[in-house]
Amino acid sequence: MSFVVIIPARFASTRLPGKPLVDINGKPMIVHVLERARESGADRVIVATDHEDVARAVEAAGGEVCMTRADHQSGTERLAEVVEKCGFSDDTVIVNVQGDEPMIPAAIIRQVAENLAQRQVGMATLAVPIHHAEEAFNPNAVKVVMDAEGYALYFSRAAIPWDRDRFAASQEVIGDTFLRHLGIYGYRAGFIRRYVTWAPSPLEHIEMLEQLRVLWYGEKIHVAVAQEVPGTGVDTPEDLERVRAELH
């Protein structure tokens, strides 16, 4: 099947300045992500960045770059600029791979593209089971609940669904009902164009989760359980050291 991967790579980062270019065993992190995306079988892989140093690193690795503005408020807004600059048709399948996921399996990049292509929906994403209470109650682990057809009902930083009877007795054992959302999305290009015309929603501001804008406006997001669990993403210096050890 035909799809395009876009990797937003914003240079500024509060916790890890210059994050796309941090060295992981001899390569900039963004190059590791680029290589994983290429392995997915995508027709094109484009790195969207606002910084010349990132562009140079990607081009040195033979990658394609689209320079974007620095003032985007979200990764989806950056994607929309790339969609317009590249002139993608509305039915083009776009997969958004985060630029700080050097251990993302190529298989799940393709999985989200295939899931979207098989459905009449504008957006698709993935999740993985949560097995430990610490993760279920961690606000940095976004949870998702779905309907019977696999469409998202809600995303939250809270522990959803709340297991009333189980948690009344103990919050140390969580059962098998929790799913952690992965930050990988598939879209049709036309859906991205529509998304950026919508005003941010109140729920989006409360939870700080941009995908809630989609549900607020009555659109569907398909969610599937990922075929493989991705490795550690890089948000902090501690994450970086962990990834360096795992990729050694």
Curated annotation (Swiss-Prot):
GO terms for molecular function: 3-deoxy-manno-octulosonate cytidylyltransferase activity. It catalyses: 3-deoxy-alpha-D-manno-oct-2-ulosonate + CTP = CMP-3-deoxy-beta-D-manno-octulosonate + diphosphate. SUPFAM superfamilies: Nucleotide-diphospho-sugar transferases. One of its GO terms (biological process) is lipopolysaccharide biosynthetic process. It is found in: Cytoplasm. InterPro entries: Cytidylyl_trans, KdsB, Nucleotide-diphossugar_trans. It comes from the Bacteria. Disulfide bonds: none annotated. The keyword Cell membrane does not apply. Keywords: Cytoplasm, Lipopolysaccharide biosynthesis, Nucleotidyltransferase, Transferase. Pathway: Nucleotide-sugar biosynthesis; CMP-3-deoxy-D-manno-octulosonate biosynthesis; CMP-3-deoxy-D-manno-octulosonate from 3-deoxy-D-manno-octulosonate and CTP: step 1/1; Bacterial outer membrane biogenesis; lipopolysaccharide biosynthesis. One of its GO terms (cellular component) is cytosol. Its EC number is 2.7.7.38. It holds the Pfam family CTP_transf_3. It is an enzyme of class 2 (transferase). HAMAP family: KdsB (MF_00057). Belongs to the KdsB family. Activates KDO (a required 8-carbon sugar) for incorporation into bacterial lipopolysaccharide in Gram-negative bacteria. This is 3-deoxy-manno-octulosonate cytidylyltransferase. The lineage of its organism: Bacteria, Pseudomonadati, Pseudomonadota, Gammaproteobacteria, Enterobacterales. The gene is kdsB.
